[in-house]
Amino acid sequence: MADEEAGGTERMEISAELPQTPQRLASWWDQQVDFYTAFLHHLAQLVPEIYFAEMDPDLEKQEESVQMSIFTPLEWYLFGEDPDICLEKLKHSGAFQLCGRVFKSGETTYSCRDCAIDPTCVLCMDCFQDSVHKNHRYKMHTSTGGGFCDCGDTEAWKTGPFCVNHEPGRAGTIKENSRCPLNEEVIVQARKIFPSVIKYVVEMTIWEEEKELPPELQIREKNERYYCVLFNDEHHSYDHVIYSLQRALDCELAEAQLHTTAIDKEGRRAVKAGAYAACQEAKEDIKSHSENVSQHPLHVEVLHSEIMAHQKFALRLGSWMNKIMSYSSDFRQIFCQACLREEPDSENPCLISRLMLWDAKLYKGARKILHELIFSSFFMEMEYKKLFAMEFVKYYKQLQKEYISDDHDRSISITALSVQMFTVPTLARHLIEEQNVISVITETLLEVLPEYLDRNNKFNFQGYSQDKLGRVYAVICDLKYILISKPTIWTERLRMQFLEGFRSFLKILTCMQGMEEIRRQVGQHIEVDPDWEAAIAIQMQLKNILLMFQEWCACDEELLLVAYKECHKAVMRCSTSFISSSKTVVQSCGHSLETKSYRVSEDLVSIHLPLSRTLAGLHVRLSRLGAVSRLHEFVSFEDFQVEVLVEYPLRCLVLVAQVVAEMWRRNGLSLISQVFYYQDVKCREEMYDKDIIMLQIGASLMDPNKFLLLVLQRYELAEAFNKTISTKDQDLIKQYNTLIEEMLQVLIYIVGERYVPGVGNVTKEEVTMREIIHLLCIEPMPHSAIAKNLPENENNETGLENVINKVATFKKPGVSGHGVYELKDESLKDFNMYFYHYSKTQHSKAEHMQKKRRKQENKDEALPPPPPPEFCPAFSKVINLLNCDIMMYILRTVFERAIDTDSNLWTEGMLQMAFHILALGLLEEKQQLQKAPEEEVTFDFYHKASRLGSSAMNIQMLLEKLKGIPQLEGQKDMITWILQMFDTVKRLREKSCLIVATTSGSESIKNDEITHDKEKAERKRKAEAARLHRQKIMAQMSALQKNFIETHKLMYDNTSEMPGKEDSIMEEESTPAVSDYSRIALGPKRGPSVTEKEVLTCILCQEEQEVKIENNAMVLSACVQKSTALTQHRGKPIELSGEALDPLFMDPDLAYGTYTGSCGHVMHAVCWQKYFEAVQLSSQQRIHVDLFDLESGEYLCPLCKSLCNTVIPIIPLQPQKINSENADALAQLLTLARWIQTVLARISGYNIRHAKGENPIPIFFNQGMGDSTLEFHSILSFGVESSIKYSNSIKEMVILFATTIYRIGLKVPPDERDPRVPMLTWSTCAFTIQAIENLLGDEGKPLFGALQNRQHNGLKALMQFAVAQRITCPQVLIQKHLVRLLSVVLPNIKSEDTPCLLSIDLFHVLVGAVLAFPSLYWDDPVDLQPSSVSSSYNHLYLFHLITMAHMLQILLTVDTGLPLAQVQEDSEEAHSASSFFAEISQYTSGSIGCDIPGWYLWVSLKNGITPYLRCAALFFHYLLGVTPPEELHTNSAEGEYSALCSYLSLPTNLFLLFQEYWDTVRPLLQRWCADPALLNCLKQKNTVVRYPRKRNSLIELPDDYSCLLNQASHFRCPRSADDERKHPVLCLFCGAILCSQNICCQEIVNGEEVGACIFHALHCGAGVCIFLKIRECRVVLVEGKARGCAYPAPYLDEYGETDPGLKRGNPLHLSRERYRKLHLVWQQHCIIEEIARSQETNQMLFGFNWQLL
């Protein structure tokens, strides 16, 4: 590519005709008559030269050239003097009061729920932080890009429109309309320059020619250089484009990726340069290759190099204009004027309109810059914003059509600017009045959807394009924006234009009324489910718009009546087929109704009735205004035809009933989904609720008997009630019963649901409270669940916060879960079992919960309806449904069928509903009688329910009979309540006046209460008797249990573990009394090993087996992992592969360790192998993403599903007992000096033996060791025994586990013969113990009293495995490793690579030395090991030597800069410390100061050595089985130290060790301290590790989440200069912010591409890490390259809930408890486990590509 570029036409020199300096050029321009021509001439000469190298540009040089030769002269010409000085003056002349920041994609925006006019009013981060809204109920969201900060816009905020920086009165701030201090000359120059600049920018941006420039720019000799330019589209994926480029251009992957990234970012890129023919060929190749992978070819053009240059510069010139306009309002106004000016002799529109109309054809980069120009000019000046909006509306239809045909995102379309104009209240009014914008938008909708209209002119979205329809929603959104602020003042013109828009909107609703009609499928099931999503989605989009239109209409009574008339007309027009069709007559109880012969089960029916529902909404608002009485003025009674209005909503409710009755099951899932959404919170407000209201309107205006006849007819139940149906078809009976239930339920809703302002006398707050009460009657709920179940208004508000505390109390969350609201007891009285927003499941659950609660409170289980509020006058006649003849007949029929034992045409649910209707009628009559004299009450429900009439029994008598039916025991309480209510109403009826009636009513109520009290007392007595009976039985069971335990006491004494004790275990396992033995682990006084018979059960085959060394192996499932949990230097460079690594010595900073954890579940080795093979086989057959890496030996524990990658063989502890006489005798002989001499003699002997071999032990001895070789066998004289013989099965498992540790610890292929295998075994033992000790210390738990079962079992198995592992290796190898370890602590021996004392972790040395030491007893002919007494001394002296070395480590690195606050008194330990420190100070040649107080040294030593002692105690306990002192099971810091010393055979004054061994240790001290490497370490104090090591924790996070967002907003990608959307991710281990999921920051690891987070995790956490995605508030756990999972973030809102993705946007604050839990997941090494568990529960066919995170 570079060669081709260089081979093009030679660059032209800048013309000598033009002046060379900016000042002279400015002067020359001033002398020209026509600036535009002169300017273009200048550009024609320079631009192609500057932007010559398009393929590989030198961006810095380009910018420098364009600045010097074009922008600086322009600025000189504009200001007439040095532009830098002028711009600086303008900069300091004051900040503009409008912020105007344009949001980038991914940027955080803030809105205030208290003050914003609507949710589109947002602030940028900086303005928000300095505003009053920070302390309000704000919301945080992530911008999709292209938005605008509204700080300073007084129309956007109710209060606090300005932040501190943009406050008008503040010094340095200027008002919107004030003028910057520009002199007239500058303004004149601007009027010359700006039109020319804008015209050039527009002309070049929309230039279509590929080969030729405009004539005025063709002054150079034309070259033959072209570019093949590839454009971005949304049809092709990244990979498609890369593939096409690789094939067409024959280029490398990296080059293709570079091109693709640039195309995605900028929208286009030159991918080839050269002659026209070559570029044309490349174009055709790219198109053909891209067609192979997609139906659409890529958009490619061949452009002349000069066209490319000018187009690129035009955009750069646009950015320059942006900069200039930011300095002055005058500049902005001149720019706007120039953009809006129409050319006199041209048919073209003004420049800004031309840009708008060309927007859809522009590429991404051009669009962005031009939109920014609009933001920084028109939108910063209110007057010109209005003019721009008028131009926008003028071309609105064309712009939207082009957007719908386009494939680019909405955020980079000119149509996205609508929100900036339509949501400004004054501007919206102006556009409605002057340009009829509502009609424009609605007409646009009709014009873009004609393809979806059927022959009846109704929408039918079958086979719709999801993408296209998704773009249509943008037009619907604009309608919402224009209506979002209701006008407070109505002018005649506004009223007229709004009505015009409303009529236009009704046309859309007419096309939706009855759309997508369906017919019941009979015979066979439908073959293909029809599309239903589009129609429901449009219904959802229109929900708030419908409500807003209704609210706008309700602002003005006249307007509302006219709108009602128009809507009524539209409904009638859609109902012509119903009006003209044939009729049928329905009769019952002497009443008849003539209606259309229509059956929902046979004829066409639609769920979409927006016109009818809008009319219902307008009717309710008429009722609210009290204007229903005027309705006849606009719609005559003859034309009203209420039956027609009721018809379609009633059909819809019948359809729902029949779906419930499974009559439509052959119509498939499509209908079920529609019915679900019809009643769901997202749609119900403008669907289901409005249908109920329309039926209430019908009931209020029709004769009640005729209304019920219509209902019976449509439910197809008229015959079911008129005659007894004799059928044995159980399905048909079930169908009838379901339909009757559904009908009764709807009747309950019509009569009882009055919580709609305008239907009942209620407020919006009362409606919301009732919704909340009924939700919380189901169960306590979190805030988000309540909000999710409440309908939102146009501002996305539910009204929840205003009322929730009146009806519920908040219960705070624990460490997991979320906070919930619980209903207050006083709100329970408002529970209505037949609440119309309950689903079937919710209804059942609520009924169950309330009955259960009443039972617990010893109350009856009756759940009568609460007294309903009064109907509004317009709906007052609805109650006549209750006492009409047909209703009484329906109720009587239901009760009679229930009494008839042969009848099966009733259900208990049906009876419940009938009782509910009875209760409603009685409550209504009772309320009326209590409010008015008896003679004024015409509602006679009691009379009609208690009269006999034509039947033998009245309803009251039927109830008495029902009460005695055993099957209805559950309804007895409700029947009792109704009968009592009958009695109450009867008494009220018997009184002749209101006062007496009220008194009588209260007396009857008192009688009711007495009856209730008696029943309550009876219930309480029964409950108490039952409780005593249970207590008696429990006591008998307890006595039997104790008797059994006493009888079988022996068995219980021998039980090793108490079942069910998961969280902690007791270490004393069937031990003798404390006085029986010594609790000392080391030396001659060592206590006995506590061992027991261990019988374990395999979780796979459930067979038991005793653990013995000669038996087949049993294993624990385990997971080995690399860990940085203890590191003292986070991010220390790591070798990704350990081919050359020597892991014998661990660095003291514990940078990378190998941790072994186990879930504690036991299997036979054979069973595990079979299980693993089965897992491998099933994994090969699965199509899901692999959950684990089988090649690495991974599997899920069969029981707990923890991720494992190996097994630990369970090897029993070999009992060891020391003969006290032998020990005492040996104590006299085996001093430390003698022991060292013996060990050195043995090593020396081995060295001589191997001297002739190939691999001698690489050591050298100090002088004086010559004779020691004669004592080669003397080590055996202190006690030996035969080595343990393990079964082959155990050996195999030992080798397998050791090889796994080696493979994972070093990241190398498995090799069981590698000499480093034993090193890794010792290392994982040491590191695992250190990690567990660190965790216990971090949690403040005792060393032995708080170990979890799995930790206890895992450590026990790990230590015994380590003992056995030595035997599976060549002993010569172990000896070599041992000698290297001993060279650190033995005075007369030093290996060539012996490390400096300060550069090793001595606990690792201790573990390695102890486990390797028995190898010294091995010799060729015999396989021996030390006896118990020998090993007790070996352990004691090794431990003492290494402890002294560690003491020296601590004292050499003591932190002298942090003395303790108070001076401690002198003590023996302090004196010892001072004198010892003075001694070693001499040995280090004064490298450490000796003026540190003794008490400080002693305290530092004690604190520093305690973790080491705790680790040693754990190690020796699990190695030897000696029970530790009781103090180590309790949480006592002071008692712990002395107990540790006692257990480990140490004096509490540790300096006594040196006194005891001084002669032996002194040479060693001198050698250690004189080591040059050690002295060098002491000089580099900043890198030295101090003790105790710091306990790692996750980074400190701010309490307020907005602080983190602020931090992220300032994040700049280290490898990318652009400000495109980034995904800043915070590492919670080290605090680094990374650029995630972006190609710019990908790295190559072992030939594979990995994202920035995965690459960081490899170094920071050895592949395991915790990240916080800042802009999404999501925690992500990752492990390795291909695994990860989401985890609840530690940030909660005030309701105790997380907010992943900031979807709710509530303020978030750090939960310390949650963050602590996350910290423990890390420190317990459970991250891998969490990931595996998450992946197991959330299996996906195609998982997230974690590798590129």
Curated annotation (Swiss-Prot):
It is an enzyme of class 2 (transferase). Coiled coil: none annotated. The keyword Phosphoprotein applies. Its EC number is 2.3.2.27. The modification N-acetylalanine is found at A2. Residues 1019-1054 are annotated as: UBC2-binding region (U2BR). It is found in: Cytoplasm, Cytosol. GO terms for molecular function: L-leucine binding; ubiquitin protein ligase activity; zinc ion binding. Zn(2+) 3 binds at C112, C115, C127, H133, H136, C151, C163, H166. Zn(2+) 5 binds at C1159, H1161, C1197, C1200. Zn(2+) 4 binds at C1098, C1101, H1164, C1167. The modification Phosphoserine is found at S1179. The keyword Cell division does not apply. Its main location: cytoplasm. Broadly expressed, with highest levels in skeletal muscle, kidney and pancreas. Present in acinar cells of the pancreas (at protein level). Zn(2+) 2 binds at C99, C112, C115, C124, C127, H133, H136, C149. The modification Phosphothreonine is found at T21. Pathway: Protein modification; protein ubiquitination. Changing V122L: In JBS; decreased, but detectable activity in a yeast-based assay; changes the specificity for N-degrons; 2.6-fold decrease in affinity for N-degron peptide RLFS. A zinc finger (UBR-type) spans 97-168. Zn(2+) 6 binds at C1627, C1630, C1653. Residues 842-868 are annotated as: Disordered. Zn(2+) 1 binds at C99, C124, C127, C149, C151, C163. Belongs to the E3 ubiquitin-protein ligase UBR1-like family. E3 ubiquitin-protein ligase which is a component of the N-end rule pathway. Recognizes and binds proteins bearing specific N-terminal residues that are destabilizing according to the N-end rule, leading to their ubiquitination and subsequent degradation. Recognizes both type-1 and type-2 N-degrons, containing positively charged amino acids (Arg, Lys and His) and bulky and hydrophobic amino acids, respectively. Does not ubiquitinate proteins that are acetylated at the N-terminus. In contrast, it strongly binds methylated N-degrons. This is E3 ubiquitin-protein ligase UBR1. It comes from Homo sapiens (Human). The gene is UBR1.
